């Protein structure tokens, strides 16, 4: 980031908020491809005679690409000039792909610089490495959700109109040429589509340039949450003094505090309708959860607020059925691969007063997380480890590997799943997953050696797999002191790790 600031100050771009000239800097494209500055021009898929700079990145090539983007149908030339023009035959999407890769780096600079400057002003840089873990959310839910009454499971709506995204970025990027280029990339790259949707064209866009796609999606979510947070803090009895909720940690790791929000004159008259001192909000993937200790009427008001926000501010229709209001403890929801609920658990205590004894039974809610075995089996079946009934099958694609590589792959998958699901309140489902993976591994090895599973296991012994399928309690016994907790009690308690920064690929197969 200091390197970025040096380039900006040297070129005089920082004071004027100009980002467009950075598109012509060679180091931007080196960073986009995660390579050094002395990489040859093959990164641009062009020969050196076109780039004009031999074995270095060419700003001349970038200028030519941008010029051809602005000139409609400029890539169509006559056959007579094809020998002199090396650009003939390129698809127009090639130009957008090359420019958008550098554009994704450039548009992140204002956000990153403001984040660094805000941290320096506070002079307190907290170590948030542990907060980046996915498991860091669950202790928060355990502490808060057990005292709440209602929860709303909200599906963040789409599509997002492309012009709305440009207007959102306009509050941060005060560079008109950059915004014009962004509009051109949007409308031409999407072949006339005016919105980002989860269809095939949007998938291709996210596949070609996932960095820019995630940046645009995060910008849209920041706008939604900033307005919601403004209303929540303005209506709350216990107003917070800082704004620091966690973002999706992709290329920028915080939110800015100063958000410009336009309010109408009678806005304060309606704030009392939303006063709730116990409102909690958590977002994950394309969904969010809003829980409250208030009444059902209050949750319906928040639901109406979200629907009107998406329709009036973002200009697209949002169906009220996207927001489901449910009451604890009669509700379970999928959250990051876990089936979460807040059941009421009874506990009894015997009390004696004089000659009379009493049995006191108390009911306390407790946040629980469990593994939903049916979606997990479906995920394993999709990955070709078993069929839809949960019966293990061989993995023919891995039969050409060595025995140690096959066992290592199966063992690594199980250890990763066991590590991710260590927070489950009931770990019996892990034994079912272990059974499927172990037998699938044995059948893959038997298929490779043209033998039966029974004969293969009798020849090598069941201890052959123990080294590769080390259970979580065995790992804990090596890490924790023997006198800290009983091992059987520790294996039943949820354990949250602070080193998990991504969801397991098999968990991603769930229809969340």
From Swiss-Prot:
Its main location: plastid. Pfam families: Intron_maturas2 (PF01348), MatK_N (PF01824). It is found in: Plastid, Chloroplast. Usually encoded in the trnK tRNA gene intron. Probably assists in splicing its own and other chloroplast group II introns. PANTHER family: MATURASE K. Belongs to the intron maturase 2 family. MatK subfamily. This is Maturase K. It comes from Lemna trisulca (Ivy-leaved duckweed). The gene is matK.
